[in-house]
């Protein structure tokens, strides 16, 4: 596996650990349907939380959350809609971003709640 892929997996693992420490229940990781993927699907307090994880070794070039473009938001919302319909979920939905910066074992994590809202298509 390429080094950037290893960093990404370590970042997702760190994000899951963070969420579990904060009493989130992880429903799925890397859930896929067709071409769509959700990094983490979690639940807490009767709410479904869709989490996009962005991992970077540093912020010299840009902030990790800057990689969540309007196109990425659109794809995430479509994937979430597919997930909700497939599993017949009737709960409020929230879209979060977790940024993971640093090296494995020494990550800095930021949880951005309600990072974006579903756009109108």
Swiss-Prot record:
Signal peptide: none annotated. CDD domains: PoNe_Nuclease (cd20736). Gene3D superfamilies: 3.40.1350.10. Coiled coil: none annotated. It holds the Pfam family UPF0102. It comes from the Bacteria. One of its GO terms (molecular function) is nucleic acid binding. Belongs to the UPF0102 family. This is UPF0102 protein BF0634.
